[in-house]
């Protein structure tokens, strides 16, 4: 029996990725009544844990982090009103492969070694839900993590395969970050810090070096989604991933375990890679992932 939604489906590698890059988009479309499904490929077992409370859960200790991150993902999706988690192949089918060059990639369940089974699992989801919009990663997986790169390949292959088996996804996007917007907000943080103004860099954090945060040239971005009205939901979702993310007291930035400040942007960015581009605004970009599709997004 089909449970087709015609909504938005996003494919992410680990718990927290859905919030960092697309949390505002999820919250915006849910606020408009659009069905949203987040498919997560691993449990994020190899993540570095912030603080001492849950440090013993790490992969090199009790190796229980993945189970706890299911809870964090559940809380984050609840904050975004996106429903319960959905894991590719079922929770625990594939394991976090770790950063490039680490031994964790040799684990028999490492996602980088998932093969055709992962593609088929996602095809089944696409044929079941028949989303009108799918969001995945670019070929570099954003910042080059092996699981992100694998998620890109799995999503791309699954979208193509689903088209041959009855559901041609109308619009397929990559989630990216606009380099100009990232620089604008990072420079604003630097000025606040230098002047000792409210919202300065938290103690122990540092500003990102040039090209340290993943981003793409602004002229490659096709679509901007305004998420300013739902930033409270995105911040709540970021805080839900407490083993991985710290949100600054100002709420304007967050940091991973490396303490590099990343801005919580008022917009999220995409590149349309499959489907017809919809009507554009004065900036030459779409401002709705469903732009140009028949019927409203809500």
From Swiss-Prot:
Family annotation (InterPro entries): GlcNAc_PI_deacetylase-related, LmbE-like_dom_sf, Mycothiol_biosynthesis_MshB
Ranges in a coiled coil: none
Keywords: Hydrolase, Metal-binding, Zinc
Transmembrane segments: none
A GO BP annotation: mycothiol biosynthetic process
Binding site for Zn(2+): 14, 17, 148
Cofactor: Zn(2+)
Region (Disordered): 277-298
Molecular functions (GO terms): N-acetylglucosaminylinositol deacetylase activity; zinc ion binding
Keyword Hydrolase: yes
The keyword Nucleus appears for this protein: no
EC number(s) reported in the record: 3.5.1.103
Catalyzed chemical reaction(s): 1D-myo-inositol 2-acetamido-2-deoxy-alpha-D-glucopyranoside + H2O = 1D-myo-inositol 2-amino-2-deoxy-alpha-D-glucopyranoside + acetate
UniProt family annotation: Belongs to the MshB deacetylase family.
PANTHER family cross-referenced by the UniProt entry: 1D-MYO-INOSITOL 2-ACETAMIDO-2-DEOXY-ALPHA-D-GLUCOPYRANOSIDE DEACETYLASE (PTHR12993:SF26), N-ACETYLGLUCOSAMINYL-PHOSPHATIDYLINOSITOL DE-N-ACETYLASE-RELATED (PTHR12993)
Job of this protein: Catalyzes the deacetylation of 1D-myo-inositol 2-acetamido-2-deoxy-alpha-D-glucopyranoside (GlcNAc-Ins) in the mycothiol biosynthesis pathway.
Protein name: 1D-myo-inositol 2-acetamido-2-deoxy-alpha-D-glucopyranoside deacetylase
């Amino acid at each position: 029996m089909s449970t087709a939604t015609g909504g938005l489906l996003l494919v992410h590698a680990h718990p927290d990725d859905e919030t960092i890059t697309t949390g505002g988009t999820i919250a915006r479309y849910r606020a408009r009544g659009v069905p949203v499904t987040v498919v997560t490929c691993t449990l994020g077992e190899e993540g570095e844990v912030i603080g001492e409370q849950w440090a013993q859960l790490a992969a090199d200790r009790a190796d229980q982090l993945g189970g706890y991150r299911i809870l964090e993902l559940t809380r984050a999706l609840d904050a975004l009103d996106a429903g319960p988690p959905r894991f590719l192949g079922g929770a625990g089918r594939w394991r976090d492969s770790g950063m490039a060059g680490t031994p964790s990639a040799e684990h028999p369940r490492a996602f980088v070694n998932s093969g055709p089974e992962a593609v088929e699992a996602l095809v089944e989801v696409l044929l079941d839900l028949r989303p009108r919009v799918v969001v995945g990663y670019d070929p570099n997986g954003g910042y080059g993590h092996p699981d992100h790169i694998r998620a890109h390949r799995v999503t791309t292959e699954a979208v193509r395969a689903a088209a041959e088996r009855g559901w041609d996804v109308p619009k397929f996007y990559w989630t990216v970050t606009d380099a100009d917007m990232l620089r604008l907000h990072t420079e604003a943080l630097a000025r606040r810090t230098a002047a000792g103004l409210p919202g300065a860099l938290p103690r122990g954090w540092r500003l990102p070096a040039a090209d340290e945060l993943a981003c793409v040239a602004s002229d490659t971005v096709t679509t901007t989604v305004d998420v300013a009205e739902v930033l409270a939901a995105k911040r709540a979702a970021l805080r839900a991933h407490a083993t991985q993310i710290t949100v600054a007291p100002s709420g304007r930035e967050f940091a991973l375990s490396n303490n590099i400040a990343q801005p919580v942007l008022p917009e999220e960015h995409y590149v349309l890679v499959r489907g017809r581009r919809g009507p554009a605004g004065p900036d030459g970009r779409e401002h709705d992932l469903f732009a140009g599709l028949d019927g409203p997004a809500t």
